[in-house]
Amino acid sequence: MAETTQTAGLSPRRTRIVILGGGFGGVYAARHLENLCRRRQDVEIVLVSRDNYLLMTPLLFEVCSGALDSFHCSVPIRAFLRATRFVEATVQSVDLERRVVQLAGHAESRELAYDQLVLALGAMTNRAMIPGSENALTFKTLGDALLLRTHIIERFERADIESDPERKRALLTLVIIGGGLVGVELFGELTAFVDGIAPYYKHVNRDDVRFVLLQGAERIMPEIDPHLADYGARVLERRTGAEIRTKTVVREIEPGKVQLSDGTIEAGTIILAAGIVPSSVVAALPVTKDIRGHIVVNATMQCQAHPEVWALGDCPQIMAPGGNPYPNLAQHALREAKTLAKNIFFALNGRAPEPFVYNTLGMMGSLGHGRAFGQLLGVRVRGVVAWFVRRTYYLMQMPGWGRRLRIMIDWAFALLSRPDLVKISVDSEAASLLRKAKLEGAFAKSQNEQTTQTDGGADRHEEVSRSGMRLGNAQRAGATQAGFHPGTGGES
């Protein structure tokens, strides 16, 4: 066990477990470790995340459609984890040999040492797969959902005063690239949202609104039962008049335009929901990875060359006993978190870790208001019943009855009224000025501040190096503090 000096609120001579990522896997791993180590005064749990909340990602679709308040689908990490030290920062890199994590946040850079490390950094949208993908919106974070909702409302506002019919139709065309489960669920919620707001615009004809779902494979949602995928396609086409185009190759995304192998679509809203890759931090780690960039771990979720490093969620490829990988679903992340926490506790006590084994309960997806589909324990469900079961399941996953009640109230109002048309700006003049002031202040500090020297006898656990932040790091920190996070999808 390594020693530590008491700095920045850290206690001396404690084994430190550092968890990187504030998603389902990271937060629930910390929660289970709190319970297991509640009588261990020699253990410290530290969770690092760029956001100070746990986002219930399965409910993010309804934030975008306005059926759910954004605050009601997120849980403050500090309130949820009372015995864990929370650090709001962005993970820049991990040094596996020195066992330290490089962090950046709040206009300063520092190192955080660990004895046990948990990688739960999630995944990010693979923008490298399509040229020009920077011209498309993404859907991974709370900021993405609010930005997308505002973007669609703004397109309707512009279309309402547009006199050119062709330009109006282009503004009202929504294209989603990616026909997997996420793309289809988002497609269903957005069509319901547009149906709700369209009557408010007197100079917009519903027939001018066009929905296009592009999928490279032979069918949409290849990860689920073909019968359920066909049901989803029929519902979307019948209810919304959507165009579902399979076996379609996207060549390039231009501003307001999608170039296909067989033509071009002009669109006011383009969303990239195809392809995810592990975070850039994971990509830079010198460990064995599979062809998709996932860390290769053993059955106990440990890295092969570094048994003190554990991974779960979207970071690793965890193989089931039959030889197939477990799907990257929230239910698996929750179960992985429980097993991983138990294995770390075993490691601290000199016991052998246990392999992760879990039988998938099933998969469910929403198609918008009153429609859903799923397969639960091998039984197919669809329609209103599936919609109700899906909502009930995710409602009960939300910690605390206070937030559950707020969600139920939101859902009740959404059933009885049309979506709200308020267009929320994601930036402001005041935020821009504040960001500029922070950048200038950080730069001045970096010119005047001397590098803090640590004691020769200080342990490697000392949180280091307030050595003066370079301007590039200050810019990243300022952008994170003053605006929404870009849609990288990582949880760091």
Predicted segment positions?
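Beta1-alpha1 glycine-rich phosphate/pyrophosphate-binding loop at the start
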Residues: A2-S93, L174-V175, L181-I224, R470, ...
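C-terminal, flexible cofactor-proximal segment of oxidoreductases
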Residues: A2-T5, P12, H332, A341-S492
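FAD-binding core/adjacent interface of flavoenzyme oxidoreductases
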Residues: A2-R14, R85-V175, I271, E491
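A Rossmann-like FAD-binding core segment of flavoenzymes
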Residues: T84-V100, L112, T191-A299, C303-A305, ...
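FAD-site-proximal beta/loop scaffold in flavoenzymes
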Residues: A2-Q6, E134-D164, G256-Q259, T264-R335
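Rossmann-like dinucleotide-binding core of oxidoreductases
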Residues: K168-I224, Y231, A242-R245, P327-F346, ...
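Short glycine-rich anion-binding loops that position phosphate/pyrophosphate groups of nucleotides
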Residues: G25, G122-T125, F187, I276-P278
